[in-house]
Amino acid sequence: ANYLCYLLVFTLAYALTRRPWAAVAIGGLVAMTFGIANYFVVQFRGQPILPWDFQSFATAMTVSGGYEYVPTQKMAVSAMGYICTVVLCYKLSPHGLPAPPRSLRLAERFSALAVSVLLVVMLFPLNGLEGLGISVWAWNQKTSSERTGIAAGFFANVNFMLVEEPAGYSAGRV
């Protein structure tokens, strides 16, 4: 399920650019940035990045200045691997070929977008992650994300943000 979350990012990047090397560059950068940010958040706070953390992003940026960020050796190796992969994908991609017909370009974008929509429908409102055996251990998010994967755990937590209003609720009566 974790791979499906990453596939969503890569297919959206391909739908936007229609270039495999650009999709690898964008998708890899998003995944690597999220992973590094999550590493430091776990180091400082003891739990991973959660969807509702984005609501307090400004506060996090203010507080973040008080910490020291030292990249690990694994981060450096990952960054070098990412750069090498992007360069390799760029070098292997065809250059100087005549542009394919507009209909083919649109079909490629539409296909990538269709896969992205399918992944969104599968992962989000239909609780598709639960069907894949991904559940959130709400009281220990760090262990939960270690078991399920950070991306799948993050997206599984999105369901907790989609709260239905109770029957008979009135803001005036609160």
What feature does the model see in each segment?
Residues 27-174:
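N-terminal secretory/membrane-targeting segments
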Residues 1-35:
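Membrane-anchoring hydrophobic segments
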